[in-house]
Amino acid sequence: MPNARVFKILAAAKLNNIALEIPAYQHGVTNKSAEFLLKFPAGKVPAFEGPDGFCLVESDAIAQYVAQSGPQASQLLGQDAMSSAKIRQWISFFAEEIYPTVLDLVMWRVGLGAFDETTETKALTQLVYGLSVLEKHLGTGALLVGDKLTLADLTGASTLLWAFMHIVDEPMRQQYPNVVAWYLKVVQNEEVEEVFGKPNFIEKRRLGAK
């Protein structure tokens, strides 16, 4: 399963015309090697190393660095204090309110954990809350901040990638037309569609432990 946190980084690089090299990687092996841990002591991925040896972890930090390192920095990160703060607000919203919930809902569905009814119910309630907040906001505009793609949009689309693949099925999508339209607008944007690929929507999500 693709690491959803990487897509926002790759999309920001694409908009900035920055070529990123993605080396071969085996989870639990590469990130436990002495060479990797020397550069990234926490052993976490994604991890970034620049041509000058600059090393960075945490996907939001890497995405911000890549976004700030090219000609579209002001578009991606905001042209003034207010737009920058709004972009950061939405990035934080996805990180705190939606991504952990998506993990709880997806992991058992892809064989990386056991189904737990209490966790499932709580996580689904939280996802509904997050999508409802987005639905209301996106009723005022097609994108999260302004009228061009920002790092907020790229982060949001990356965060919801697994959700649309495994959880937000057709009946659920009908409840959030603004969110679906926004998601498609982001991932089908000609500048980043190569990164996100064709939208992969689940028709009926798996229920219980079936």
Curated annotation (Swiss-Prot):
One matching Pfam family: GST_N
Record's keyword terms, sorted: Transferase
Entries under InterPro entries matching the protein: EF-GSTs (IPR050802), Glutathione-S-Trfase_C-like (IPR010987), Glutathione-S-Trfase_C_sf (IPR036282), Glutathione_S-Trfase (IPR040079), Glutathione_S-Trfase_N (IPR004045), GST_C (IPR004046), Thioredoxin-like_sf (IPR036249)
Cited SUPFAM superfamilies: GST C-terminal domain-like (SSF47616), Thioredoxin-like (SSF52833)
GO MF terms, alphabetically ordered: transferase activity
Domain GST C-terminal, first and last residues per copy: 80-206
One Gene Ontology biological process: translational elongation
GO cellular component, one term: cytoplasm
Positions of the GST N-terminal domain: 1-74
Induction details: Expressed under high amounts of nitrogen via regulation by GLN1. Moreover, components of the fungal-specific velvet complex VEL1, VEL2 and LAE1 act also as positive regulators of expression. Finally, expression is induced under acidic conditions in a PACC-independent manner.
UniProt key word Transferase: yes
EC number: 2.5.1.-
Record note on disruption phenotype: Does not alter fusarin C production.
PANTHER family, per database record: ELONGATION FACTOR 1-GAMMA (PTHR43986), ELONGATION FACTOR EEF-1B GAMMA SUBUNIT, PUTATIVE (AFU_ORTHOLOGUE AFUA_1G17120)-RELATED (PTHR43986:SF10)
Family: Belongs to the GST superfamily.
General function of this protein: Glutathione S-transferase-like protein; part of the gene cluster that mediates the biosynthesis of the mycotoxin fusarin C. Within the cluster, FUS1, FUS2, FUS8 and FUS9 are sufficient for fusarin production. The other FUS cluster members are not essential for fusarin C biosynthesis.
Name of this protein: Glutathione S-transferase-like protein FUS3
Organism lineage: Eukaryota, Fungi, Dikarya, Ascomycota, Pezizomycotina
